Amino acid sequence: MRKIGGMSMLLASAAFLLWLAPAWGQKPAAPEITPEQLRQLLDQKADVVLINTMSAIECRDHAIPGSLCLPCETFTDQIDKLPADKGKKLVYYCESDLCLRSYKSANKAKELGYRDVSVLKGGLPGWKQAGYRTVAQERIPRKAISSVKASRLKKWLEEGKPIFLLDIRSEDAFRQGEIKGAVNIPFYRLDRQYSDLPLDRQIVLIDERGFRSFLASCYLSRKGYDTTRLFGGMESWQKALKESNRKPAGKKK
């Protein structure tokens, strides 16, 4: 019995790692450019097309001056916004050095035949840390937003607490694994679909690791919604689920 239990645990662990792989695997191969190198190109008035791969809400809230806003999830629908000249330099970036959206978009551009494509190393935080300027078309006021740990959220669900689970991850990430009962409105669609959300229930926002949900919560709070965030995002939920399923091995008789 112990062997069977051990094998089950091994298979469960392998399945968990496979679930994580598409979202948190290694960054796809794409050339990187440092904030200093990019700043030098911009100072030299080089012909560079900057592309912000975040949602429209994030793009309006903070971006490198002169950037196009082309969310990774809408790449195929917005190919016409890319330059006709396949030799132009394209620089993609997103909200953190852990974000894969910029790498995915960069590789898609290369597949279309663009020859000079790179990704900003460190993303937008790296740009800011280097001391360079960002712009905001519509800065979202920040406020204190509570968060709920996975164990507490699990208890809420078991007790039937009247909450609304809003998963703002991409459609692909949602299909690969979601919390039962959650509704998927990806962040890039939130500015167009927030009115579909209920005003009479607390909304629990779920993202990848608990970072993007803060800005999304501030945005919804400004619209009159009562929000909280899943601490650590879906990553923490999966970790908690894995730990709760782990059973101690029985004693040898």
Identify the meaning behind each predicted range:
Residues 12-13, 23:
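Cleavable N-terminal signal peptides
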